[in-house]
Regions:
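Ankyrin-repeat and related helical/solenoid repeat scaffolds used for protein-protein interactions
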Residues: 110-151
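Leucine-rich solenoid repeat scaffolds
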Residues: 136-179
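Ankyrin repeat boundary signal
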Residues: 18-21, 70-71, 104, 137-138
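Extracellular/periplasmic ectodomains of large secreted or surface enzymes and adhesion receptors
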Residues: 70-81, 91-92, 173, 178-180
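Solvent-exposed, polar/charged alpha-helical surfaces in well-ordered, non-transmembrane soluble domains
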Residues: 6-9, 30, 56-59, 123-126, ...
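Ankyrin repeat A-helix N-terminal signature
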Residues: 1-4, 31-54, 80-108, 115-121, ...
Length: 180
């Protein structure tokens, strides 16, 4: 199960490297915040945990030394399309990228905050911002967490995060940043 805080504690107690990322740069914090798996992505049963438990996993990952603004590393592949259009469909040159074995290349340079927004988890969005997450972080395609909150086509569905959008707008305004 993703975001499983009790299992994370067991693994850390057994000596697992609590900051080790996978080959795409996804850290335990990112996975806990939901930048790993999206309900509806596969036909199987719900495999995550409720948002309050996932929030505890996020807190634990930070306490264990994960960097709050770490970025994914899906590769440095040219992707064609605007930030706005690639939120709703794959890059125009997706056929050139599909066999590279990188997963969804649109997720290059994402942060834990991006993941929390994708999964519509406002409590985690708020907590990450309070802990210093870069509110206006842009991925390789230029997506910000606020842009994602307005809608992202992923796992054969259009996902929005209206609760996160309000938190992000308030944080951006408090920091005097662009509200995009």
């Amino acid at each position: 199960r993703n975001g499983d805080e009790p299992m994370m504690r067991v693994l850390a107690a057994a000596g697992a490297d609590a900051t080790k990322s996978n080959r795409f740069g996804v850290t335990p914090l990112m996975a806990a915040a939901c930048l790993d798996y999206y309900e509806g992505e596969t036909a199987g049963p719900f495999s995550g945990v409720p948002e309050p438990q996932r929030l505890e996993a996020v807190k634990l990952a930070l306490a264990l030394g994960n960097q709050i603004n770490a970025r994914t590393t899906f590769g440095d592949y040219k992707m064609i399309g605007t930030p706005e259009t690639t939120l709703l469909r794959y890059p125009d040159n997706f056929q050139d990228l599909v066999d590279l074995g990188t997963g969804d290349p649109r997720f290059a340079e994402m942060t834990a905050l991006h993941g929390a927004v994708i999964c519509n988890q406002p409590s985690i969005v708020k907590y990450l911002i309070e802990q210093g997450a870069e509110v206006n972080a842009r991925n390789r395609l230029g997506w910000t967490p606020l842009m994602i909150s307005g809608g992202l086509y992923i796992a054969n569905a259009h996902k929005t995060s209206p609760g996160s959008a309000q938190i992000l707008r308030e944080a951006l305004a408090a920091q005097g940043l662009n509200r995009r």
